[in-house]
């Protein structure tokens, strides 16, 4: 609370710590750069050798835990990165 008051907050709503959360959607996957941050490989549209390998690629949350999907995408991404490095494109 002291931190909020120090920066001028007039109201704060403390919440208990969460046992776990799934933070999603901050680096949206998209076909076109104007619609998101990364392509289908998790590669950023503007920096060819920068990849995002977490749940932030998801455009929205699903009904189930995203961990296995995140792992699957990361494995697929690792194969793609290895292939691109072998070709000298990144």
Can you name each region flagged by the protein language model?
Residues 58-63, 86-90:
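Glycine- and aromatic-enriched mobile tails/lids
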